[in-house]
Amino acid sequence: MAVAPEADAPAQWHRVLTLLATVSLFIGTRAVWTQAASRELVIAAVISLCYLSILVSGVLALTARRTRTLARLDLCVLLTAMTLTLCTFALNHAGGDEGVLTAQAARELAAGHPVYGQPWPWLFQHNPDVALTPTMNGGYDLTYGYPPLVPLLTAPLLWLGHGALAATVVTTGALLVGAVTLWRLLPVPWRSAATMVCLGFGFLPSYARLGYPAIVALALLIPVVVRWPRIGAGGRLGWGGFARAACLGAACAAQQLPWFLVPFLLAGIYAVRRGELGARTAAWVVLRITGAAVTVWLLINTYFMVSEPRTWASGVALPLTQNATIHGQGLVGLALYYTDGSDRLAWYSHASMLLAGALLALLVLFVRRLGPATTVLPWCAFFLATRSQDGYYLLMTPLWLAAAVTTPATSFARAWQPRPRFLSGPRRRAALVATAALLLVPALACTAVAATGSPPLAMRVTRALTTGPTAVSELTVRVTNRDDSALTPHFTLTTGQGMTRWWTAVQGPATLPAHTSAVYRLQPPGPVFRVPRRPGTRIRLRVFTASPDTLSSMDIRLPGGRQNVKDHPAVRPAR
């Protein structure tokens, strides 16, 4: 006679999820252990114990007989992940440019000095490993460009040490709190997914160690996004609803990424509540949520709005207005890597904004279908932006998980969808498809305009001065402006996806008139430019201009290197 399985036996998918979370803890752990074993033996011992915990957890995940036992194992996996995160932080907490700027902003705040609009070049002079953000006008962004919540949280911790330590403590602590919050709010069988996404894969802890303010915003958004269609159910917010609205306002006061999520969330809440309660009550619910969020945002920003209104306004909007050089993994790579540039870079920004608006409109029109993807849709627009770095996508991925687990499609079954007469007739399916296509056409058209642009400057390297077999001290370049407007060129050399600092033009006109040529003598930002010896390295001479924003590039050969050079008529070996 067959024996019936235990009624309390965990589901197989729960076992697999716990096992995957356990396996994810191996990612990057060996490198941290190797680093610790050479100088911090206590941390190395703790990491070794974490290895033991991982192995034991793997066995128990496959052999636990009761759901409660597996749930306790999920807690053990979370604690192991938190321990590994803290061990890694103890070894690597110097911070990146965001962390360094945040810590300096906190110091200025504690000293009673202005925070916004103040350039701090010495931060980057004394930290050569900290990245600079170059701008299209040939300069760098050396000021603080985020809302003030994270400096306010960092200021009380400045006693911990110099550098960016206080800022990275805040962001790493926020990540741990966010991971625990998401773990606690998810249904029991799904909790290991929170461990895996927040801590296991390693990319979010690395951003936290760099001091990214977006990590604090993420932690504040987690309680907002979990079961978000229930906010205002029955027309009542209650203390929980007001608390979530306050978290939304605080997240917007920590970093700018939540600004893009807010319209989508509010539109989704309005649609769900209108389907339940009607237009007037739904509008009242959204108005109260907005009011609570704005109140918290204003409270956090009030001191800066009063003490430095102009610089505060320009500072918090800086990522949107700084006109940084193009960079990222999105469509802008066409101009960076696959062509010789474009004279229509601004159209990528137009396309990104139009796509964001189109996606918001599509969410409103098709909320019953797109509602579960509300926390993912805003980030799609960044794929077309001039700064389409993958951090804009992955920093908010825990919100994707929260929505996937807690906001099923059934939550939107009765949501209101606007259906004017031309979308509700006998041919409504064709009309809806046509409307969706028309909403996307402007963004696609702008993308096509940007992608088909041509480089406005033609270049030819005529001489390269060297001080050694692989050291270039000066380049001479002949530049021809083929555009109809005068351009102010700014030069740099790249050997990969990043960008080195600007080269100095010691000879040549600052502005090159239309349809003219000039010779420029360029010197590297350091004493020399080291030519990579690695075979296949691609060296590109890039020229950026502002007003209009353009990029002109060419592959070059330099003495002493073994580079792959694109077959291009302007590419000639330096003599």
Where are these regions (language model features)?
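Primarily membrane-embedded glycan-assembly and transfer machineries that use lipid-linked glycans
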Residues: M1-V77, L84-P213, A217-I222, I231-G234, ...
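Membrane-interface alpha helices of multi-pass inner-membrane proteins
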Residues: L199-S206, L221-P223, W239-A267, L299, ...
